[in-house]
UniProtKB/Swiss-Prot annotation:
Description of what induces expression: By UV treatment.
Keyword terms, alphabetized: DNA-binding, Nucleus, Transcription, Transcription regulation
Organism (species): Arabidopsis thaliana (Mouse-ear cress)
Name of protein: Transcription factor bHLH10
GO biological process, one term: anther wall tapetum development
One GO CC annotation: nucleus
InterPro entries: bHLH91-like (IPR045895), bHLH_dom (IPR011598), HLH_DNA-bd_sf (IPR036638), MYC1-like_bHLH (IPR045896)
Region (Disordered): 1-49, 315-338
Oligomeric form and interacting partners: Homodimer.
Subcellular location: Nucleus
bHLH domain sequence ranges: 243-292
UniProt-recorded Gene Ontology molecular function terms: DNA binding; DNA-binding transcription factor activity; protein dimerization activity
Amino acid sequence: MEEERESLYEEMGCFDPNTPAEVTVESSFSQAEPPPPPPQVLVAGSTSNSNCSVEVEELSEFHLSPQDCPQASSTPLQFHINPPPPPPPPCDQLHNNLIHQMASHQQQHSNWDNGYQDFVNLGPNSATTPDLLSLLHLPRCSLPPNHHPSSMLPTSFSDIMSSSSAAAVMYDPLFHLNFPMQPRDQNQLRNGSCLLGVEDQIQMDANGGMNVLYFEGANNNNGGFENEILEFNNGVTRKGRGSRKSRTSPTERERRVHFNDRFFDLKNLIPNPTKIDRASIVGEAIDYIKELLRTIEEFKMLVEKKRCGRFRSKKRARVGEGGGGEDQEEEEDTVNYKPQSEVDQSCFNKNNNNSLRCSWLKRKSKVTEVDVRIIDDEVTIKLVQKKKINCLLFTTKVLDQLQLDLHHVAGGQIGEHYSFLFNTKICEGSCVYASGIADTLMEVVEKQYMEAVPSNGY
């Protein structure tokens, strides 16, 4: 039996590519295994006859190592199932066969070493390392971490790897090379292969984001910019000069805010603004200023007229009490009287003792328009309103309250509006002015109109 097994090992180059190693070994020795003897160990050179029945499988069985796998994957393995062996030979013959078997086992180990060298030669050439490896962190294993090793190996070797001893056969040919990390190439980094380096800056903004600044030197062709900075801020890239001013300066921003505030204040000063745009606000403000100036002139004329009236009445009283000498003094006082202003000069005329009064005022709202003109003691009023109510009755009541004598009234309908024209005269002893007449009419007519309009709208 030992001679057959010795010939079996001599014929064996490596394992069968279509049969796993463990299954083949078990199938070849299962039939030749004798009954299990007591657990005894045979020592070389021993002459004891009690250890003759040595278990042959313990001597012939050997374990696979990482160096044994390449040879096993290159040469087919042939096994022949022999018939049941005869009874075991004597111990002396078994001892001699064991010595020959150990010699053949050493020869087999040399074959595995040669196979390992062939497997190393199959790996990539370590003398020429590509430049791409210097830019990457090389893993300790050449295979991908989520890749099964059987996809890169031959079919026969994948069958061996599928067994329970596949972990002992795994081997990485690049592990023993231990490539050092090479310094990066600055020229390749300038072309865009990497942005982080010595001249790169990483900053953290106030919101917790990361800003990466990459500086390009003067020798690089940067398209006309002397000093360029690439800024990466939360995924947004901006290219431009380093010292770049904002589009809107603080002075311009403050000026715009100041103008908006002034327009808002001007709108609040207008009594009844019709539109909210800036052009309309400015136009209505100009009209309102002119109106105020006319009102001031009107007040000055009224004050001067009253003062002149008091002066005349006082002089007349003196004439009634005294004689002719007093009349001469009155004429001298009248000649010596001088007006205190230009308005006084226009109102006071020493030749005929007459004063000319002239004023004009216009007020307008969304639903009502009032135009008042005063020439001496005659007052002309024009009133326009939407045709919701008849405002003629309320207007006549207001004229009676202002002590205006109504001489003529004309009216008509123009589209969706009523238009009325009133010709009145100021009664003697009455003190009225254009702004007072317009404001009173606007207040009364607007109140009656809002009461007539339903609450749900027009």
